[in-house]
Amino acid sequence: MKNILVIVDAQNDFIDGALGSEEAKSRIANISNKIKSFTDGVIITTQDTHQENYLETKEGKALPVAHCIQYSQGWGINIEVAASIIAKAATDPSVSYDSVTKPTFGSTELMEKIASYVGDEDFNITFVGFCTDICVVSNALLTKAAFYERANVYVDASCCAGVTPEKHNAALEVMKSCQIIVENE
């Protein structure tokens, strides 16, 4: 069975930048430990990616906080998370790495990458990252819908943070209702 670890939007703007929080900061060590313990599979990072005209977009009008502007400091993957991925890839030949940039919450490109990686096999996929109630839940539900019979979909709650703790918990409940396995609450 194939294994996938998806690190959703572990970007500076969601940790200590424009949309950062203490909860997100406190999850970085957990994410790094999750990377270090991962074996025999692929690690995929997603990056929320917007352009300079973000505030003029539909999302920008609904969430008027410029964030994750492509190539800005806030768009970058957190240095501790990036270092953990690099160290893992350099020392464990059973682990490969891929990435997806995405302009919206859920990523159809991520679904395509998952499909190309797993082929017709059953697989385990674990989601970690930010924000639990926006991009983590969107991608976990897309995966559950796209690969329902073949995927064991997990979310590690100890490696996620939402916009608020209440929204984080609400998203976890929604995912459990949709038969996503939530671990480490």
Feature locations, PLM:
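Short glycine-enriched, charge-decorated loop/helix-capping segments at active-site entrances
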Residues: G17-K25, A62-C68
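Active-site-adjacent betaalpha module
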Residues: K2-I4, N30-K36, D40-G41, V65-E185
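Active-site loop signature of alpha/beta-hydrolase-fold enzymes
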Residues: D13, E52, A161-G162
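Von Willebrand factor
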Residues: I35-N53
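Short, hydrophobic/glycine-enriched beta-strand segments
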Residues: N3-A10, F14
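Metal-dependent catalytic neighborhoods of phosphoester/phosphodiester hydrolases
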Residues: Y54-E59
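Active-site neighborhood of HAD-like aspartate-dependent phosphohydrolases
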Residues: D13-L19, S32-N33
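Active-site metal-binding loops of divalent metal-dependent hydrolases
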Residues: A10, D48-T49, F130, C159
